[in-house]
């Protein structure tokens, strides 16, 4: 009986996330729930952008190539595609805007920071969404991005912050009241 009671109490907090066909749809749905928990400034020298090696996530079927991105403070992005080295450039314009491309003025796009913490990084391409082919750049810390696919990584991001929204103070107050009542009627 005690197990059933605990299962019923825990059930509302064990929410299964819906399946999405594309990474873009999933990010559109999950981003509003986690946006407030991330860092907000790309200009900070201690920002995760510069401290973490990022793996680019994709929802292309059959894609197995690991693309590891390292953002250097000098404006260079060193990219390893399964060990083969490549490079790009970036320039931080404001706290939440960055240009990323082959060079700052060639094959480059303006992105806006949507979410950044020590494990996940999401940029959204600036402009009219109807004209944009790839709306988001989604990166994960190397330890996450090399072992999970895009939908599992997004679930991990949501789970990380879902627990932070849980009203622990409320639970502690209720628990204290229950213990107090039990001691009183003992």
Q: What label would you give each PLM region?
A:
Residues 1-72, 78-80, 84-85, 100-186:
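Lipid interaction determinants
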Residues 94-98:
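Short, conserved beta-turn/loop elements at beta-strand boundaries and strand-helix junctions
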């Amino acid at each position: 009986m005690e197990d059933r009671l605990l299962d019923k109490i825990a059930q509302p907090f064990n929410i299964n996330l819906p399946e999405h066909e594309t990474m873009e749809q999933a990010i559109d749905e999950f981003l509003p729930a986690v946006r407030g928990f991330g860092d907000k400034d790309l200009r900070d020298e201690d920002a995760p952008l510069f401290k973490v090696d990022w793996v680019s996530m994709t929802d292309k079927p059959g894609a197995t190539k690991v693309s590891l991105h390292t953002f250097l403070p000098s404006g260079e992005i060193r990219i390893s595609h399964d060990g083969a080295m490549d490079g790009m450039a970036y320039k931080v314009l404001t706290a939440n805007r960055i240009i990323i491309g082959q060079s700052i003025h060639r094959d480059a796009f303006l992105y806006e920071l949507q979410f950044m913490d020590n494990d996940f990084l999401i940029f959204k391409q600036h402009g009219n969404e109807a004209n944009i082919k790839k709306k988001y750049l989604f990166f994960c810390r190397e330890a996450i991005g090399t072992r999970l696919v895009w939908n599992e990584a997004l679930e991990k991001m949501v789970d990380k912050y879902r627990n932070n929204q849980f009203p622990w103070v409320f639970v502690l107050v209720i628990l204290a009241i229950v213990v107090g009542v039990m001691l009183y009627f003992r």
